[in-house]
UniProtKB/Swiss-Prot annotation:
CDD domains: PoNe_Nuclease. This is UPF0102 protein PP_1324. Gene3D superfamilies: 3.40.1350.10. PANTHER family: UPF0102 PROTEIN YRAN. InterPro entries: Restrct_endonuc-II-like (IPR011335), tRNA_endonuc-like_dom_sf (IPR011856), UPF0102_YraN-like (IPR003509). The lineage of its organism: Bacteria, Pseudomonadati, Pseudomonadota, Gammaproteobacteria, Pseudomonadales. Belongs to the UPF0102 family. HAMAP family: UPF0102. One of its GO terms (molecular function) is nucleic acid binding. NCBIfam families: PRK12497.1-3, YraN family protein.
Length: 124
């Protein structure tokens, strides 16, 4: 009998699926799991001339709210802080327009699970 995937492994698999999907849509990866004192950015990508900060959310069940529902005001503030620090450290991206997207995956960890890509998920 196989053990269930750990939340960390499930999250990494969701990030990989999101990355592959977004690259298939023409986005280019700038950074993955970029960490700073203010938090972490799952994916930082370039969409034409726009820097995109992508939060990947995975939920097995919607019992406590779905993946999209898990981006509350506190989480948004942490993402904005991390994005600000990224743009300060990676100053060459500082003059590019930017946006915050969310990729939400819900359901079993098998390939082909439904993926939702919400562009401009919130304003800062």
């Amino acid at each position: 009998m196989m053990a269930a995937a750990s939340p960390t492994r499930a999250g990494q698999a969701a990030e990989t699926q999101a990355l592959e999907y977004l690259q298939g849509q023409g986005l280019q990866l700038l950074a993955r799991n970029w960490r700073c004192k203010g938090g972490e950015l799952d994916l930082v990508m370039l969409d034409a001339d726009t820097v995109v900060f992508v939060e990947v959310r995975y939920r097995l069940h919607a019992g406590f709210g779905g993946a999209l529902d898990s981006i509350d005001g506190r989480k948004q503030k942490r993402l904005v802080l991390a994005a600000t620090l990224f743009l300060q450290k990676e100053a060459h991206w500082g003059n590019y327009p930017c946006r915050f997207d969310v990729v939400a995956l819900q359901g079993s960890h098998h390939a082909g699970r439904p993926l939702q890509w919400l562009k401009n998920a919130f304003e800062c």
